[in-house]
Amino acid sequence: VAGRFDPRPTRTTVRGGHVVVPGQAPADRSGGLGGRTRRWAPPWPVDLGLVLGPLRRGPADPTFRTTPDGAVWRASLTPVGPGTLRVSVRAGVVEGEAWGPGAEWLLEQLPLMLGESDDPDAFEPRHRLVAVARHRRPGLRLTRTGLVLESLIPSILEQKVTTDEAYRAWRLLVRKYGVPAPGPGPGAVAGRGGAGGGMFVMPSPRVWALIPSWEWHRAGVDNKRASTILRVVQVARRMEEAVGFEAGRAQERLEVVVGVGPWTSAEVVQRSHGAADAVTVGDLHLPGIVGYALAGDRDADDSVMLSLLEPYAGQRHRAARLILLSGRTPARRQPRMPRGDIGRL
């Protein structure tokens, strides 16, 4: 299996996909901020940082914010237009408020986004480390956004570069070519005005297609990744159709595009579909982390990793996330990969 995906990209999965969300502030915001609202009481504990964390592309992601009152804000390009969603949890009740043409769509998707379609009870730990990690994180459920491009484009940017480089490119391109997020934005909670609150909705497929070559260069995106994104947005409708497929078939649809391989397609369906079995192959560090955690083998490759995860068939992505969240990772043996910036050339 490993040979199929070599050479492995110099990029690693976000460590567990956990974002720290401040504790819920006691202040009563029952009046809202003028958006459409929805309340939902799931019969399980919701951990916004664990569930929504994989959707954040770096601490300065213009499409994702957390605020001191314990809320998570997201700006998305939905099938019906741009939308902003604020999500918080109070006494076990999820409170959603949304703005923009995509507001109703985002509120309708809210339960799925917070893991309603996930089935963590189907997961049976086979290793003590995994069992302990699961016990310590009862709020871990897999998000299902129902959106493909918002995960596909940043995943392409993350191919074969450091996360810092990819996050910078995403941040620069979304801020320059996206649109301000609808609604008051996170600043309104702190009494600061300004539409969108500094958040942006990612560009539409048409706008991505019109970005000049020198702007990709300035953002540090090489021609190979830029060309892949251009190919993807040319068939944007076909890409989004994959939401209606089961995860394996969706990956096949995405991989029809030249430049989108198993690593990228897995990173997408983990988010768009909540795919519990879509383990990331071709990652620089994940095989060594899984190998070290489960067998003490820090030099494991994809084939070894998949063999170790075989007892978790059907739930391999969840197992990998729990391993990442356990914190049991091998000590670094070499300096971090230096950040490159082709924009300076």
Region roles according to the model:
Residues 2-345:
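HhH-family (HhH-GPD) DNA N-glycosylase catalytic core used in base-excision repair
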